[in-house]
Amino acid sequence: MSRPVPNPGILDIAPYTPGKSPVPEAGRKVFKLSANETPFGPSPKAMDAYRNAVAHLQDYPEGTSRVLREAIGRAYGLDPDRIICGAGSDEILNLLAHVYLSHGDEAVSTTHSFLVYPIATTANGAENVVAPEVDYTADVDAILQRVTPKTKMVWLANPNNPTGTYLPFDEIKRLHGGLPPHVLLVLDAAYSDYVSRNDYELGIELAATTGNTVLTHTFSKIHGLAALRIGWMFGPAHVVDAVNRIRGPFNVSTPAMLAAAAAIGDTAHVQMSKVHTEKWRNWLTDEVTKLGLKVTPSVTNFILIHFPTTKGKTASEADAFLTKRGLVLRALDNYGLPNALRMTIGTEEANRLVADGLRDFMAQK
């Protein structure tokens, strides 16, 4: 039977699988620690802005997200005209791929990088080239070795999801310096707000001064606006112009726009979340390590826990054990990490329950 046929490569893409969203059961408290969501929710100022926007739902949004672009510009010292807002940074990543990748092109990502990168690459007919990592960390030399005349883009999450590792800014500059000027370097800084390292920078300097670097960011993580789907990009004027030509005219809703503008101004809320995350990330790393499990050093709001392959001690068995206790972590088979679980840093209660649960799991005979 004849029917419409998708473009080549589309059906080869494995659909993105989000973290589990469990249905609470009567009499049992459930902690979702699978999607790197903040346990504190959004800023009260963001919620007030969202509520106030409800009275104007009959009106189309302002098509360029001007209010939000200006708020981002003030927060980071950026030119608002070089900022684009999108329905999550995912939309912007896909728009970049649509603008710059086509059949016969290549884009480089690393072994355990965000799955949207290979999806966006393949969906636009290009080939995803994988550069191996070292200790679950992007390797600049490996990336540069895989750049060919066909390469049009390099994707780099810094810090990386799902490993929680990062590259110092000197390494980012070295990576950029080794790329031909026609290769676009995409720096995804979704988790940057959690980083407290002196050698880390978002990459604003490169995005501001070079013609082939963009920085993307999101309001889904530390700002707690994941449900509103809001992200942004800063980059060269010519990249912004190209992306704006295919961006939907009303791609960011008014409630999302105003909530995000309020959220970015509430620095006290952000700092509170950052301090909590760092404290409990360190605590969890220590507690889990005491159990004989390896934890990849993280600078984000999650940790990557590695399990043995011994029957009775595997990641999948630990996942099932914790789920029965209402503790939902993220299995990572689709990231090529079948022996690991990713855990979002949650409330104190959730963190202690996971530590206790893993202790009981590892003590089983």
Curated annotation (Swiss-Prot):
Provide the positions where the record notes the PTM N6-(pyridoxal phosphate)lysine.
221
Q: Which domain of life is it from?
A: Bacteria
User: What would you give as a GO molecular function for this chain, any one?
Assistant: pyridoxal phosphate binding
Which keywords describe this protein according to UniProt? Amino-acid biosynthesis, Aminotransferase, Histidine biosynthesis, Pyridoxal phosphate, Transferase
Task: State the needed cofactors, names only.
Answer: pyridoxal 5'-phosphate
One GO BP annotation of this record? L-histidine biosynthetic process
Q: Which Pfam families match?
A: Aminotran_1_2
Keyword Transferase on this protein?
yes
Q: What class of enzyme is it?
A: transferase
Question: What pathway is this protein said to act in by its record?
Answer: Amino-acid biosynthesis; L-histidine biosynthesis; L-histidine from 5-phospho-alpha-D-ribose 1-diphosphate: step 7/9
Catalysed reaction(s) here are: L-histidinol phosphate + 2-oxoglutarate = 3-(imidazol-4-yl)-2-oxopropyl phosphate + L-glutamate
Coiled-coil annotation: which residues? Answer: none
E.C. number? 2.6.1.9
Q: Which cysteines are joined by disulfide bonds?
A: none
UniProt xrefs under SUPFAM superfamilies: PLP-dependent transferases
Q: PANTHER family in the record, alphabetically?
A: HISTIDINOL-PHOSPHATE AMINOTRANSFERASE, HISTIDINOL-PHOSPHATE AMINOTRANSFERASE 2
Tell me how this protein assembles: Homodimer.
Which family, according to UniProt? Belongs to the class-II pyridoxal-phosphate-dependent aminotransferase family. Histidinol-phosphate aminotransferase subfamily.
Name of the protein in its database record: Histidinol-phosphate aminotransferase
Origin species? Nitrobacter hamburgensis (strain DSM 10229 / NCIMB 13809 / X14)
Gene that produces this protein:
hisC
